[in-house]
Amino acid sequence: MAGRGGELTEALVKKTGREEEDELGMKEKVWIESKKLWVVAAPAIFTRYSTFGVSMVTQAFIGHLGPTELAAYSITFTILLRFSNGILLGMAGALGTLCGQAYGAKQYQMLGIYLQRSWIVLTGGTICLMPVFIFAGPILLALGQEERIVRVARVLALWVIGINFSFVPSFTCQMFLQAQSKNKIISYVTAVSLGLHVFFSWLLVAHFNFGITGAMTSMLIAFWLPIIVQLLYVTCGGCKDTWRGFSMLAFKDLWPVLKLSLSSGGMLCLELWYNSVLVLLTGNLKNAEVALDALAICISINALEMMIALGFLAAVSVRVSNELGSGNPKGAKFATLIAVFTSLSIGIVLFFVFLFLRGRISYIFTTSEAVAAEVADLSPLLAFSILLNSVQPVLSGVAIGAGWQGYVAYVNLACYYLVGIPIGVILGYVVGLQVKGVWIGMLFGIFVQTCVLTVMTLRTDWDQQVSTSLRNINRWVVPESRDANQISSEE
């Protein structure tokens, strides 16, 4: 009877809190939701820029070793590491769904168990991806790369195995901490790591002349240092409510986590590989050198803006999953609206900035007049890419928060690879629009995908989503009173 009374009291408290929230004016609601959004988005954006900075610093130091080394680095990271990164980051997205909804439902003891289950699943995935790096030489030769570049890339690929394994604790700890809006710590340590990486790269490459060995050693330190700090923070008191120690329960109910991880991996890697396909298609066009240089500049600019959008993807997935887990359908819908509006507002500003600047911004990256002219010609497409990318990742974040990854994977496959790429091939090769035609086709694929996700979001029954989320939470939950490090005989 006492337990029943406790449940009733908790329900009344929740209801009273909701009623107070409903009585707030629209300005106050927007302000409160925006603060919750930026608490996750700002550190997520900063972390992505710091991680991107580590790669850029390494590229700069390796570039001074020679053009062959630079080409090998670019191929290794653009083709091999992006391939595995897309899969593992996508698979970690499942943890964002599970932890976010469990945290919203106040089932705090489950977050640590979900984290450990994701470590098991992603470690298995990383081991399965190892042959890609071990046999990098034959793979790159089969893709038509020059043998002299492949010889260096083969060495780099073995170093990258260590970076690939760092993604397991890195991505999972990020999702675990983001679900609790505690990801500030990640931004602090990645900033320090970037500064140390610059110093160690100079020391090992420029001062001691250790070449590729020095550059990759510094990079490994830069990737693993933040992870060590995050793991210490999680396991040594920074998350007392959600980390209850290592548990044998991590080995139970792995199948639902694996299924959701595979759906998440399919959803995100199909998005991340899309730009790689654009580069491959452009490389086969006539007079591709100038086009590739211009496209590389445009993609670099687009990637910088994309980090803002990916920050909002992380934030809205947390907000939606938290609200669904807490049984608040209105809150999930409102969080979606605020995230889309905020990201779209930033996208509109950047859209007009790049339309106005056109080719002038290219002189930051090149001194070639031909390349600058090509960038100016591509600037309208770059501006539209930035505009679309301010909405599409946010809607993908809503999908992660709600657990729709499997559906969105099919949407991405159809829109990108059955619509966007074929249209790009026709416009680029048949109609003769060259790189512009390929990009228009790819943009059309993104536009169709954005429209489909928008319709899916608008037609969502949020009350039904709450019921589905709570049903899943109750199915997998471990009672808090139970010893988390034991599995009872009846199980």
Curated annotation (Swiss-Prot):
GO molecular function annotation: antiporter activity; xenobiotic transmembrane transporter activity
GO cellular component terms given for this protein: membrane
Compartment list: Membrane
Alphabetic keyword roster: Membrane, Transmembrane, Transmembrane helix, Transport
Membrane topology (UniProt): Multi-pass membrane protein
Pfam families noted in UniProt: MatE
Keyword Transmembrane: yes
GO process terms (BP): xenobiotic detoxification by transmembrane export across the plasma membrane
Domain of life (superkingdom): Eukaryota
Transmembrane segments: 37-57, 75-95, 120-140, 156-176, 185-205, 214-234, 265-285, 296-316, 337-357, 381-401, 413-433, 438-458
CDD domains in UniProt: MATE_eukaryotic
InterPro entries per the UniProt record, alphabetical: MATE_euk (IPR045069), MATE_fam (IPR002528)
Family per record: Belongs to the multi antimicrobial extrusion (MATE) (TC 2.A.66.1) family.
Protein name: Protein DETOXIFICATION 20
Annotated gene: DTX20
